[in-house]
UniProtKB/Swiss-Prot annotation:
Segments of this protein annotated with the region Disordered: 853-911
Family: Belongs to the SecA family.
Localization per Swiss-Prot or TrEMBL: Cell inner membrane; Cytoplasm
UniProt organism field: Teredinibacter turnerae (strain ATCC 39867 / T7901)
Main localization (coarse): membrane
UniProt protein name: Protein translocase subunit SecA
Record lineage: Bacteria, Pseudomonadati, Pseudomonadota, Gammaproteobacteria, Cellvibrionales
Subunit record text: Monomer and homodimer. Part of the essential Sec protein translocation apparatus which comprises SecA, SecYEG and auxiliary proteins SecDF-YajC and YidC.
Amino acid sequence: MIGKLFRAVFGSKNDRELKRMGKLVRKINALEPEFEPLDDTQLKAKTAEFRERFNNGESLDQLLPEAFAAAREASKRAMGMRHFDVQLIGGITLHEGRIAEMKTGEGKTLVATLAAYLNGIPGKGVHIVTVNDYLARRDANWMRPVYEALGMTVGSIVSMQDPAEKREAYAADITYGTNNEYGFDYLRDNMALRKEDRMQRPLAYAVVDEVDSILIDEARTPLIISGAAEDSSVLYQAINKLIPSLKRQPEAPEGEEPTELGHFTIDEKMRSIELTEDGHQLVEELLIKNGLLGENDSLYHASNLSLLHHILSGLRAHHLYHKNVEYIVQNGQVVLIDEHTGRTMPGRRLSEGLHQAIEAKEGVAIQAESQTMASTTFQNYFRIYDKLAGMTGTADTEAFEFRQIYGLDVVVIPTNRPVARKDLNDLIFLSVEDKYDAIIEDVNEFRGKNAPVLVGTASVETSEEMSKRLTEAGIAHEVLNAKQHEREADIIAQAGRPGAVTIATNMAGRGTDIVLGGKWQAEIDKLENPTEEQIAAIKEDWKKRHEIVLEAGGLHIIGTERHESRRIDNQLRGRAGRQGDPGLSRFYLSLEDNLMRIFASDRMRAIMQTLGMEKGEAIEHRMVTNAIEKAQRKVEGRNFDYRKQLLEYDDVANDQRRVVYAQRNELLEADDIEEAIHGIREDVIAAQLESFVPPQSVEEQWDIKGLEQTLLNDYGVSVPLQQWLDEDSKMDEEGLRTKLTEVMDEIYARKCEAIGSAMRTLEKQLMLQVLDTLWKEHLQNMDALRQGINLRAYAQRNPKQEYKRESFTLFEEMLQNLKFDLTRVLFRVQPISEEQLAEMERRRQAEAAARKIQLQHEQVSGLEPEAGEAPSAGEPRSEQPYVRAGRKVGRNDPCPCGSGKKFKACHGKLG
């Protein structure tokens, strides 16, 4: 109550921000008469002037009014588009490192030019982030004339681009690209073996278009560069044949025992599956019968846990992942569908063997599992930028998450014209059949009035079902879903024509507007050399169609079901009512819809029974709509908790990632690392000596023979340590360390002399390669640790604290191994001829090409804890740490050198 009173008197925080920015807008408007008389050369020269003033100490905030006035003038001349005042407010919001919520059709692409130009003045580069290659290319080419009129360069980054082209694009003042490409290029740069192979400059400023899609919907999907690992396709196929033998146990009412027993249970809210006691027994019998498990073996023996993991993956593939809902089969491949956008995601794969299980289910080629070489998340990648901003049509519902995770405030920008769309209350039916009948009836009615209709669906399957029913009803229509995405631009261009009916999944219109009457530009583009008369006729025809649609009440939106997120529903509604156009939106729901069935059905059914509803009748009341929104908020809260949990775990890996990547960059920049190599060599010698000659010990406790053998085996160096001691009875451990260090330094110096100046380059290359190999192993070990860490909760330990502690231990071990491995390699390296070197390089390139490095935007398999986030007790993991070449020795195992000591006190110890 007090909060409402305060807002009534002082206005909301958003109102106060808009008022503050309004003063800046007036300053920019006042400068317009100064910039209009400038010729093109003088306008372009303004950029050099601004840069000079910036270098002399003026801040970007001080330059803002003039820079925005210059950008507005350039847009007027180059594009014939003048920024509205609300667009200037959007630009100020972006410059200040916040999120601008701007409704559909308000010109977000043009708004970005203001902040991009101002932040391009320091010359550090500005990245504008889009959701797909098409938009990256389109926006770069569309806005290029504005930037070039101001003397700035523009580049675009797309997939499958030549590295030289990418370097050129990143060197531009303004770079457009997709979130995936920026992230992958960051990882590639941190795998480069030469500094000239890197593409990105330090990350200064980014404007993220559709920021909710990228920073929230994509937050849980890690970017992974991987290489092929072992092939388990035969096992996946064998397990897939067993799955149909397992029967689902029906869900019992809360607090009651199940009336019918089955082999597994499904928790639809958590999207998880667990085997029952009967299920475990049957699975063991089936595995033994098919020769996958020994007669006397237990499924729960450590060596067989991978089989249980495969069974659970197979069950989830069959019962939680449905064709044409979560994925489609295209060109013999399982291609995932983004639940938020409805678009296909080629190249993205489910983790933990789930994708392979789906491939086995669908009978397509099973791709080998992969081994991670580098990875990050969008959450951590975008937080590297010095300044981050974003824009979208729907951000306010997620304002808390943007603030918590990214430190970004949301500013709701007013529309240039008031929104005239009518958002009607939901209609709720008892059954899906009743709902579809009502939709068909209303589509017919709207068509009869010449109103264009957009029917929004949540899946490919629903869109195809709606299409079938419309066809049966004799209603002509277009379908836009993941299968027809090639025709997206054409379908959207015609969706606003009088009486047009378009069925679309969530993919409809991200980055494109449905223009009432259809897009006249699309008609002109189809003509090869249109004459002035043809263009005039097309425009005249469009005006007539436009008027017809306006009279019919604009675009009519029909939502066939509610999404888990209110934001996705708002995006569908936002397709209508652009730039003050009329429009109408309504959702048609049934108690059999997923969201209603899982989260809201009991309450809804009680309401409907109280009202005495019958088949075919619908309920329409604000109270019901509020109840549905409450269910959505519950789901959104749960999803936020999972994303936050993911970030807390990834932050641990991210701290280590930053250390390793900073070390790599120092290495790449350094011309000579001889001093660092010398320090590492001294550390390794001291550690080896300490393992065999314990500090403050007597000579009888020294294992000189073991040390001599280790130096010979590991470093190829024969050192007469015993002879030194026999010749000098006064030599203590310090004297031995000094002499051993001197001798090892001499041996290394002779090797350097034999190899020549190339040794300095070789040292750097070898250190990079050893670091990369160990980092790759470390990522696998971290993943294995993460998969089982939640089980520590059963021992009354905090899993997050345990993860931090153990991951730090793993990281320390990795740094120790780096010193040992590098020293071993450097002492064993032999001088070779130029011809041998060329042959080795040729072989290395051939091997690299055959290694099939993959770029994966790996989809964690749902929001459930057991999929890529926190495993449940019912689903043990099969993942094992990456095994290094040769025998892997545990820290507490006997050292393989034969000393009789534990490995951690011998070769595994570093002083």
